[in-house]
Amino acid sequence: MNIYRKKNIIKKCFMEFFGTGLVMFFGIGCLAASKLTNANFTQFEISCIWGFGVSIAIYFSSSISGAHLNPAVTIFFWLSSKLNKRKVLPYIISQTLGSFFFTMLTYYLYNNLLISFERNNNVVRGTQESLNLASIFCVYPNYNNSFIYDFIIEIFSTALFILIVLEFNNRNSNYFLYNRSVAPILTGFLVCMINLVINPLNNISLNPARDLGPKILLSLTGWGLFSFTGGNDNILYCFIPIMGPILGANLGGWIHKTLINNS
């Protein structure tokens, strides 16, 4: 029994690793292609690719791991007593590693173009001029906004996302969606729509692993501490893409439980 459980958790962690990685590969790959080649994707196209990537990753991993693909989601399910506490840390580590390794894969696929761009534009990693390149991989809040404003936007965006996704997957009130496997497609559309509406105001992550994995990678490939701060003196901004989604996910989950699914 213990061997079976061990194999089962390994399989689930792999699906979280690979599913989160797929989201990163499609999304960051799109950003890299847009900034380093002549692809010139529009904001709409970039948002759609992120959304489709989320849908594909959910279809891939949901039957085995539940397709959390997001530490904020995992923490919410744990605090809601819907996830065994023994799975929390393995899931979060797997999601972050998936984000890290698939970002690294994308980084090395585009490495020659990245170096060429730096040489042609006299960009030195770890300087303010390198923020544009770093933003291919990482999420940096709009530093022209106040910390409180950016933090609230991140919390609101994630709360909205979780609230709607929970209702998509509510087998009691959305029996058709739940049983016809439409929810992953709608979840991808939701990611696309939130990005289109919110990103012009502030860059959002919705997912701590989406931000932390790439920043760890960049810190090891020449950007150093700049990868975390984005050159901003206010260190608090670093926590927005990590703590914002965690607080937002739990807020959205609480609203859904209290106002919608309280029967």
Curated annotation (Swiss-Prot):
Extracellular compartment residues: 37-41, 111-145, 199-202, 221-236
GO molecular function: glycerol channel activity
Disulfide bonds: none
GO CC list: plasma membrane
Pfam families documented for this protein: MIP
Domain notes: Aquaporins contain two tandem repeats each containing three membrane-spanning domains and a pore-forming loop with the signature motif Asn-Pro-Ala (NPA).
Entry's localization field: Cell membrane
Residue spans, topological domain Cytoplasmic: 1-7, 63-65, 81-86, 172-181, 260-263
The reaction(s) this protein catalyses: glycerol(in) = glycerol(out)
Family that this chain belongs to: Belongs to the MIP/aquaporin (TC 1.A.8) family.
Topology within the bilayer: Multi-pass membrane protein
Function text: Mediates glycerol diffusion across the cytoplasmic membrane via a pore-type mechanism.
InterPro entries: Aquaporin-like, MIP, MIP/Aquaporin, MIP_CS
Entry keywords, A to Z: Cell membrane, Membrane, Transmembrane, Transmembrane helix, Transport
Protein name per the record: Glycerol uptake facilitator protein
Family annotation (SUPFAM superfamilies): Aquaporin-like
Residue ranges of the TM segments: 8-36, 42-62, 87-110, 146-171, 182-198, 237-259
Gene from which this protein is expressed: glpF
Motif extent (NPA 2): 207-209
Motif (NPA 1): 70-72
Chain ranges inside the bilayer that never cross it: 66-69, 70-80, 203-206, 207-220
